[in-house]
């Protein structure tokens, strides 16, 4: 469950919601993993969004995100608790962390998933080949988005995936819900924390994050020109939405990358 500055990211709650759906299909429970410093209080929020258990790895060495100690912490949790499925948000942190963790625990990782289901693999029976049940079927765009691939990891556990923010739904919040909290200490050695953070400089963007927008007014190359985007700006203002655009528009210089 990704947190930044002791606040849960939206993707963390989305993954708890999807994890709850998958756990229901498998007849098991959903467990969230909290990694950081001074973050135990966030367990209650995860419980209210559907987590049955919360594993808390709380250590001063985890106050700021650093690849090595975070990868060590998650790999240790997986080796200790042996989950069937492990989901990570496809954020900047998740894309750095997920592949390193999967390599350490010797399992596969399907990146940037847009859909997760429990089903059979192979999906269509093949004569002479065993069809495995209750597999995680991970769907993601491939070849630049020109096709959709469904991938399974039948031979290794856990089945790991990074999931794009904004594509899964949060579960309905249940105020006052509680989860079993398990405190876990993976043990840190100098090899796990050899990078020292000397200074953190944060820049605050004045551009709205489209992931937080309820209404998007989006345009592509067909809008025709930078001047024509003023129509979309006006429409977004009327609707209370945010303007977004395609990569082609950015490449043409009609809209900034941000």
Tell where the protein language model's regions lie, with residue ranges.
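N-terminal glycine-rich FAD/FM-binding segment characteristic of electron-transfer flavoproteins
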Residues: 1-258
């Amino acid at each position: 469950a990704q947190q930044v500055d002791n606040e849960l990211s939206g993707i963390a709650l989305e993954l708890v919601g999807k994890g709850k759906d998958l756990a229901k299909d498998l007849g098991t429970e959903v467990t969230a993993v909290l990694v950081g410093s001074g973050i135990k209080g966030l367990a209650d929020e995860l419980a209210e969004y559907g987590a049955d258990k919360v594993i808390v790895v709380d250590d001063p060495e985890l106050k700021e995100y650093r690849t090595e100690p975070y990868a060590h912490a998650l790999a240790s949790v997986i080796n200790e608790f042996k989950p069937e499925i492990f989901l990570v948000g496809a954020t900047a942190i998740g894309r750095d962390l997920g592949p390193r963790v999967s390599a350490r625990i010797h399992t596969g990782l399907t990146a940037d998933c847009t859909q997760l289901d429990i089903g059979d693999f192979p999906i269509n029976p093949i004569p002479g080949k065993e069809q495995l049940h209750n597999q995680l079927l991970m769907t993601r765009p491939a070849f630049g988005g020109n096709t959709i691939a469904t991938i399974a990891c039948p031979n290794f556990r856990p089945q790991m995936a990074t999931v794009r923010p904004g594509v899964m739904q949060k579960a309905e919040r249940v105020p006052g819900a509680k989860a079993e909290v398990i405190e876990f200490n993976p043990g840190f050695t100098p090899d796990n924390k050899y990078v020292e953070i000397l200074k953190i400089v944060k820049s605050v963007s004045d551009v709205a994050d489209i992931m937080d927008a309820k209404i998007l007014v989006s345009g592509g190359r067909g809008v025709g020109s930078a001047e024509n985007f003023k129509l979309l700006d006006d429409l977004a203002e009327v609707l209370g939405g945010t303007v977004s655009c395609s990569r082609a528009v950015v490449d043409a210089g009609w809209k900034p990358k941000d």
